[in-house]
Curated annotation (Swiss-Prot):
Principal subcellular localization: host cell
Record-linked InterPro entries: Nanovirus_C8
Coiled-coil features, chain-numbered ranges: none
Source species: Faba bean necrotic yellows virus (isolate Egyptian EV1-93)
Keyword tags: Host cytoplasm, Host nucleus
Pfam families, per database record: Nanovirus_C8 (PF05629)
Entry's localization field: Host nucleus; Host cytoplasm
GO cellular component: host cell cytoplasm; host cell nucleus
Protein name as annotated: Putative nuclear shuttle protein
Amino acid sequence: MADWFSSPLKTCTHVCDFPSLAGDPQQEIMCCDSMKNKLQDSRKVLLVSCSVSFNGSFYGGNRNVRGQLQISMVEDDGVCRPIGYVPIGGYLYHNDYGYYEGARTFNLDLESQYLKKDEDYNRKFLVSVFNENGLDSQCDLKVFIVHSIRIKV
């Protein structure tokens, strides 16, 4: 891994907006290095990490909400597997808005095969929200995801 430290660092950023958390919502995102036809030689890509932060709100009285934000990745065999979970939730005593927020970084260190200069590095991710108690149409969530990538020619 030490040979990657001198490689340029690039990020891929996404925002997933869930205006309602009813029905275990999910969104697909694509991590891409956007280096197609920008280099003269083939390259390797190291997907270093996936940083996730979120904030959201819920409404109600005497309300306990909780669930999990799951980040999954489609691996080379085509199977979508979770890379990690971040708990979400809160409690509210009276009729008002409650808020929740959180963040976590998942270290991946996944090295690609050599890519031709005329192809992009792509990796599909799935962002899912799982209801454990009370997450519904009166709850929302905005998720910010930053993938850190290193590129080696």
